[in-house]
């Protein structure tokens, strides 16, 4: 849009009116908005308004609200936006006594994104907007610092070219590095005015060559184009990936903050920095941050220069440091949360550019919450809401096993995000994504000079990140802490050659596929493949925190566990029962699979029973171990579920082996073994085994299987009871679709129970229930509840059968569905509340209408997903069951659901 077109749009809009206020001003000690308006102003805009109203030294400006972004995305932008924006600009110019990009004292502004929820580095920023060929000369004269002026202009052209005009950033960097090389300069700040002028001229030629247009000289053109580019950045790939990872709604949109520039690159008495009121990695109550002198904000977080610790500022500029401490301390008490802040020092004067609630690791989140309760800033109930349920996984991140190992520490960087990662290295985000998708490397470490927001997809699939540049507030550090991944940043002894895909350190060269071990807690980079151990969930802070969490929740939290070792781990993580023991997993052990295969290959009941008789003591021993590990807690045992062919070799493998033997050794006795096996495999082959002969259908066709499993369960329970234990047995029949199927299998279980109790002279209380994993079972739950004493929703299969989507094949189209907004999230990760969830809700109500005491839970992967757990609470389930390592997450999510219900009342909606 040209300057004339901009003015025309203003004129055309002056005759219209709308109730929507698009632009909110802040400055002069007052703001149109306030800190509670995050939905409208975004987090950054609301924070700027709040700081301004609090009288803090905030450069003035204005915020264009999120509705404008949503209109932009819909392609229906109100002309009133420009009217209000230019009115706010005039107000800003009057307050500053400057004009945007004109006059002897030109006003320059920054244009930044700012969504409701923090998305660090995911969207775009333009600094020094308003500079042009005339304004740069005025700025050079006014500041008496030509180097500063020309450096600011070349930064604008590069940022504007990259963000607004889509000129590849690497082409600007190529020009910049070339001039540095020719002039013999190592550091950016050593470039002199003439060299910077040369860079500016080359940058402008590049813009013209790439776009066919000159770099815009009209300040209003720059402003409108920059604003629209920030709106567009809401939809860039990295922002969409981040929102998907953090479950931020795509239609929230971003606000745009236009703010008068203050300059940290004006000279050696100027600087810029970022910080936290507490350590975001550990939660320690210590002032934490980094800064650079003679730099702009992007220099600190980009990783291009390694910044200084903020403690150095106390020595260099004690008055500024003390003022910063006082302001940020005041803001922490005001917001009652750890603050993430940005500041600039211009000619010795401090300006606050932003404050917001800081991103932190799970370890830090728990410690900060506990400390703030002790300090009287928040209550225990508020503390429960201060930690995201998935953050508790940080307490379970792996640790390196070092005892008895010969360790070669290659370098020590900054401990940017705790935990450990051991994997094979790759050097680009694209390679990481490909290696993960293809299975080339099972565990990946992404090695970069520094990461940028474009690397987000690679960071997502990597287990750990290593950078040679950057600090504790660099992009890599901030993003990995939020993701709960290990990161070592600023490992200065490492040279990363991304072009040749090599890492050079201490005279050694590591190439793609080589193994490294990272310790994100200490910052060490270690050669080779160390072993790892999970962290112990007995951290004192975690124990304290969970002691606040558990009394609040109503929902029981069970674990999915198949063997005694898993059950013991589940107890350590707070499991109140086993919600799913998959008995078929016991058959895959090396000493059992041959008996299982013999049972399958048997062509009569007598031979099947003979094979099952050999499996009986093995299953009984496993169940005894489970009952002992869980003591008096409930143990839900599912009878055999998968189709029989899963216990046999693959048909394709058998065909290849038989064909090879026929060609090479046709008289081999092994052929006599393999041919009957192949015949049975082919006999059991199904076109759609997920809906074939499995679950209760196996028990109906081969009742001796159900009989053997029931006998093993009850004999184990009796043995444990005789030894002084108190087993609580719940037997669950899978894939039930009708009351008739349930009656058939329940009768077998109850008959075997009576036989065992009569033989042993001991009775054990037990229940028989079923899995609800077919839509028909949900629809007829009132009938099934006549026989079933409990329901457990197998939400994995219920999702498959409701959507008609195979969980194994969904990745072929899930990315496209997410991109087009058909799915907002993976339905196998988060329960589909509108569809599958309604079946769960309906079946629960119908079942309890028949049997008011019906116990109901879920045992799919959704049992460890926070949103799914909260849904289960709202519809009145008794428990959720998940993998042991998701128990902490489920416990916290259940407590948060109870508190949300306390605040809003019981849910009366469909969700």
Descriptions of predicted regions:
Residues 377-461, 524-525, 529-530, 545-550, ...:
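Protease-associated
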Residues 483-485:
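Residues forming the flavin
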């Amino acid at each position: 849009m040209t300057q004339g077109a901009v003015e025309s749009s203003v004129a055309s809009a002056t005759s219209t009116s709308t109730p929507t206020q698009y632009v909110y001003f802040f400055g002069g000690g007052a703001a149109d908005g306030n800190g509670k308006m995050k939905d409208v102003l975004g987090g950054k805009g609301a924070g700027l308004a709040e700081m301004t109203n609090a009288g803090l030294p905030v450069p003035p400006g204005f915020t264009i609200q999120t509705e404008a972004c949503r209109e932009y995305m819909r392609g229906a932008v109100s002309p009133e936006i420009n009217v209000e924006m230019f009115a706010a600009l005039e107000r800003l110019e009057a307050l500053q006594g400057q004009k945007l990009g004109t006059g002897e004292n030109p006003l320059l502004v920054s244009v930044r994104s700012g969504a409701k929820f923090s998305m660090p580095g995911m969207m775009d920023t333009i600094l020094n907007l308003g500079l042009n060929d005339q304004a740069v000369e005025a700025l050079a004269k006014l500041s008496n610092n030509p180097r500063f002026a020309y450096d600011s202009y070349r930064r604008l052209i590069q940022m504007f070219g990259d963000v607004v005009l889509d000129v590849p950033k690497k082409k600007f960097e190529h020009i910049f590095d070339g001039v540095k090389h020719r002039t013999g300069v190592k550091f950016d700040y050593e470039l002199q005015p003439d060299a910077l002028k040369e860079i500016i001229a080359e940058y402008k030629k590049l813009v013209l060559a790439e776009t066919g247009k000159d770099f815009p000289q009209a300040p209003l053109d720059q402003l409108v184009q920059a604003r629209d580019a920030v709106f567009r950045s809401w939809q860039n790939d990295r922002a969409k990936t981040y929102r998907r990872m953090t479950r931020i709604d795509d239609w929230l949109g971003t606000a745009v903050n236009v703010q008068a520039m203050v300059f940290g690159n004006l000279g050696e008495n100027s600087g810029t920095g970022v910080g936290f009121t507490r350590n975001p990695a550990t939660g320690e109550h210590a002032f934490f941050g980094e800064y650079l002198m003679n730099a702009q904000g992007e220099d600190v977080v980009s990783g291009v220069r390694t910044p200084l610790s903020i403690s150095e500022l106390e020595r260099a500029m004690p008055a500024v440091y003390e003022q910063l401490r006082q302001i940020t301390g005041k803001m922490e008490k005001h917001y009652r949360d750890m603050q993430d802040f940005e500041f600039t020092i211009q000619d010795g004067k401090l300006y606050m550019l932003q404050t917001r609630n800081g991103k932190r690791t799970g370890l830090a989140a728990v410690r900060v919450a506990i400390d703030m309760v002790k300090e009287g800033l928040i209550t225990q109930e508020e503390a429960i809401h201060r930690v995201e349920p998935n953050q508790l996984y940080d307490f379970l991140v792996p640790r390196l096993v070092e005892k008895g190992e010969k360790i070669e520490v290659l370098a020590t960087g900054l401990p940017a995000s705790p935990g450990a990662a051991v994997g094979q290295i790759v050097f680009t985000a694209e390679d990481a994504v490909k290696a993960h998708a293809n299975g080339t490397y099972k565990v990946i470490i992404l090695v970069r000079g520094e990461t940028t927001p474009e690397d987000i997809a690679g960071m997502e699939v990597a287990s750990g990140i290593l950078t040679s540049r950057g600090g504790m507030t660099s992009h890599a550090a901030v993003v990995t802490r939020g993701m709960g991944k290990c990161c070592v940043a600023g490992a200065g002894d490492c040279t990363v050659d991304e072009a040749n895909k090599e890492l050079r350190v201490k005279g050694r060269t590591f190439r793609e596929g080589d193994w490294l071990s990272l310790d994100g807690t200490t910052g060490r980079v270690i050669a080779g493949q160390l072993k790892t151990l999970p962290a112990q969930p007995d951290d004192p802070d975690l124990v304290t925190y969970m002691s606040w969490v558990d009394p609040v929740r109503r929902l029981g939290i069970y674990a999915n566990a198949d063997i005694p070792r898993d059950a013991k781990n589940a107890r350590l993580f707070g499991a109140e029962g086993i919600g799913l023991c998959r008995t078929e997993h016991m058959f895959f052990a090396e000493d059992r699979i041959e008996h299982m295969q013999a049972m399958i290959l048997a062509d009569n009941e007598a031979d099947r029973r003979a094979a099952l008789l050999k499996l009986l003591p093995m299953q009984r021993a496993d169940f005894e171990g489970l009952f002992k590990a869980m003591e008096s807690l409930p143990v839900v045992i599912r009878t055999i579920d998968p189709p029989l062919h899963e216990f046999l070799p693959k048909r394709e493998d058998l065909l290849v082996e038989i064909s090879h033997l026929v060609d090479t050794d046709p008289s081999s006795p092994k052929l006599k073994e393999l041919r009957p096996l192949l015949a049975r495999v082919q006999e059991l082959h199904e076109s759609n085994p997920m809906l074939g002969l499995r679950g209760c259908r196996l028990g109906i066709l081969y009742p001796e299987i159900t009989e053997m499993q029931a006998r093993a369960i009850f004999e184990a329970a009796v043995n444990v009871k005789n030894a002084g234990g108190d087993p609580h047995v719940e037997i669950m029949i899978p894939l039930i679709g009708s009351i008739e199927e349930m009656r058939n299998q329940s009768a077998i279980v109850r008959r075997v129970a009576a036989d065992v109790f009569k033989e042993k002279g001991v009775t054990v209380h037990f229940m028989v229930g079923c899995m609800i994993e077919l839509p028909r079972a949900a629809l007829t739950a009132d009938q099934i509840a006549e026989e079933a004493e409990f329901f457990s929703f197998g939400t994995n299969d219920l999702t498959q059968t409701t959507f008609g989507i195979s969980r194994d094949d969904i990745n072929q189209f899930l990315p496209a569905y997410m991109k087009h907004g058909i799915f907002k999230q993976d339905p196998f990760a988060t329960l589909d509340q509108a569809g599958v969830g309604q079946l769960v809700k309906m079946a629960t109500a119908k079942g309890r209408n028949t049997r008011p005491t019906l116990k109901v839970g879920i045992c799919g992967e959704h049992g460890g997903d926070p949103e799914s757990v909260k849904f289960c609470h709202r519809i009145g389930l008794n428990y959720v069951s998940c993998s042991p390592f998701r128990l902490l997450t489920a416990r916290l999510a259940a407590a948060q659901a109870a508190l949300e219900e306390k605040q809003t009342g019981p849910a009366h909606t469909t969700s």
